Every structure is written in C-alpha cells, then in structure tokens.
C-alpha cells in the first residue's frame, strides 16, 4: 500500500502539489498474543489512553514540521530561453528517478516543484527484495526479518519475506545529489498550464515563468492536472490514519512487522462500531522500531466511497486501548488517501506520466513506490532513445513511444486483473475478507509475492487465480463466484477490447 495525500490534521479529497506521497503497507508479529481485557482512562500528563474518542489522541499530534534538505540547488535560468530536453513536473521519488537517469545520458533536464528541498513527509514501506533489486538497500532505515498477518483471534500467518521502511531523507538526498552532478536544473513553482507546439511544449508556472521543453513528464501524483483522462473517474479509495509514536510498551515482536491485523475483539463492547467494521473492515498495520517506538496505522483496504477519517481514528483508538498501548507522545501523524483502480489516462497523449497520475498504483493493494521506481528506467530509456535518435521526431511521436513502453499490453492486462481483484474486495465484509486472505497467504510464496509486487502477468495471474480458488474454503469459493461474476465478465470484455 503506497500512495497518499497528507494534510496536517484533516483528510481532504484535494489535489496535491507536485510530487506524490505514498502509504506504507501493514504487517504484524509472529505470535498470537492474548491481551485480555483492561480498563483504561484518560490521564493528565504525557501518557494518554482514551475510550470512545480520538480527541485525546489527536491532542498529542505535534504541529506539522517541514524538514528541508540542507544544500543549494542549481536553479533554472529563464533569461536564457533554452529548450530543455525534459521537464519533470513533480519532485517525488518517481519524478526524481527519471530526471536522474535522463540527465545521466547527457540530456538537459529541469525539475519543477513548489518545494524541491522538502523531505517527503510520509512513511514508505517496501519489501526488501524490491529495493535490493534496484540497489537501494542503503535507503532503508529499518528492516524486519518477516511480517505477520492476523486473520482473526485464532489464526495468524507468518510471512517469511523481509520488509523495510524507506529512509525518506536518504533516498531524496541520494537522488537529488545525482541530479545535481548530472546538471539538472530546478525551478521552484507550480505548473498551471501546458501549451503544446509541434516540436516543443511550453509550461506556464504560477510565478509567471514559462519553461520550454521537448518532453513533459507529469509526476504530480493524483492531481491529474496535466495528464488527461477521457473516461469517468470512479476509483476505490484506500484511507488510513497513522502515527509514529513513543509508547510505554507494545505487544509486538520487534523483529517482525504487522502486515495486516483483521482481528476485531477490540470492538466487542461497541455494537455500532463493530457493525460498521463488519460491513467495511479496517486492519492494523504496524512497524515496531523498538520496545517503545512504533508506527501504527489503521487502514481501510479499499472502499467506494472511502471511509471517513474520524471513523478510522475511532477504530484505531479502540484497538490501542484493547492492546494496552499507552501513547506518550506522537512524532508525526499522517492521513492517507489512495485512489485505486479506475481508468487509465488517455493512451497515448502529449504529456507523459509516471506514478499516480499514470494509473500505476496497484488496484488491489495500494502499493506504488517500488513499482514506479522500477518503471523509471523504462520511461527514462524511452526518452533517451527517441531524443537521441538521428531522425527527428515530433512531440506526439515521442510521447507515443514513451507511453507505449510504460504501458505495454502485458502491463495493461495485468492491471485489468488487479482491478478485477479490487472489485471483489470492494464487496467483501469482514468475515469474507478474512476468508479471502486466509486463502491468499496460504498460496505458494511465489504467487502472493508476485501479486503484491506486480511481478505476475496474465498467464501467471490466471494460474494464481485458480490456485487461490482451490485453497479457498467452500464458503469463500461461493463468495468469489457470486460477488466476482460481474467483475469477471467486465474484465474479460475489457481484455478483449484492448488491442496492441
């Protein structure tokens, strides 16, 4: 689960500034703990535990602190009037990765972002093997030997796959320093309009500056301000509330992270909340850094419309009370909103996209960071190849070639299957969701690894689906058949209509 919009203390369905933020996934400890029932109360002083309200917890949330990188950036000089080879709009991980790789080939690049030095504010979680494949292990500041999934009070799954938290400052510093070494120029502004000509585009910024570029890359997340869509946009939404906190203690194994905890025993004394959770369930995602420092996040996997953030906060407080977790202080909190699924943008179109604006979030899980970082070389190489060819290309020809490499038919078919999975998850209540993931994590690791990391393509996904069906209980099979028939028909129709 990986892309989010973050606001200080409210979740708002708004367009982000340039760049994207990402939401981490959710895991848990290897042993089942019986926490019993305890009574808690709000206390004066640093330790707070609340019943029935998130207000006391939110009182611990500090004012938003914006941390910036401490080095000078080479700024774009508009007086020269040069046409850069590539203008990257958005300074998130994907945008900087493409800027870095295109500039390494000797092409001129301008990165445009309202806050180019700002360290990304969100907690990114990734499977360690994903970052290892990209030589980014030095950008993880914490790792766990594995993860765990709690299906219910009696069933837990050990996931023998290392997991890590991204060191946001290190990753951005590493990318920015390479960009600077390669000659990338930076412009601190927001692009409000793009005007296209035959061989170049003009980016109009909110500071009155116009930047000319041969290729424009939209890496602004979910703003969809530059990349165009021509179909109704009706995604599912993953919504979460998380805190990085100092606690008196917590019950989790510090060597494991909690990927999903679907237990609801913390709601047994709250009939209304228990019924709401049964209809649209939430789970706990936790990254324990030590015995008293932990990241905790309550997450709605996918819903349409998305759950209200105050509903999720209320569920989180009830869970923490039940687990006996007393929060002493909160270093940071985050409100996560991840649009999942929905249509792809118009393919092709003049502006090239990557990340959320290009429909790259995993429709079934919300993951995106590793996927977009892995796609950055694909986009960069396509740009380098066509800008470096001897034959001159029009702007439309260039962008068509890049979009084709970013979304080949194999990737489009893969995404269609993932959307099918999302459509089923949207219809599952808590008992059905538990049965689904009980079967999912019983699969051979190569199947659930590949599904979560977008490494399976349509032929393998069909085998994955059949294997999941065979591992499911009879009740779950019936649910998949009844709730999945219409999504399956829609998927098949879309696959048949999508041609090379």
UniProtKB/Swiss-Prot annotation:
This is Lycopene beta cyclase, chloroplastic. One of its GO terms (biological process) is carotene biosynthetic process. GO terms for molecular function: lycopene beta cyclase activity; oxidoreductase activity; oxidoreductase activity, acting on paired donors, with incorporation or reduction of molecular oxygen. The keyword Isomerase applies. It comes from the Eukaryota. One of its GO terms (cellular component) is chloroplast. Pfam families: Lycopene_cycl. The gene is LCY1. It catalyses: a carotenoid psi-end group = a carotenoid beta-end derivative.
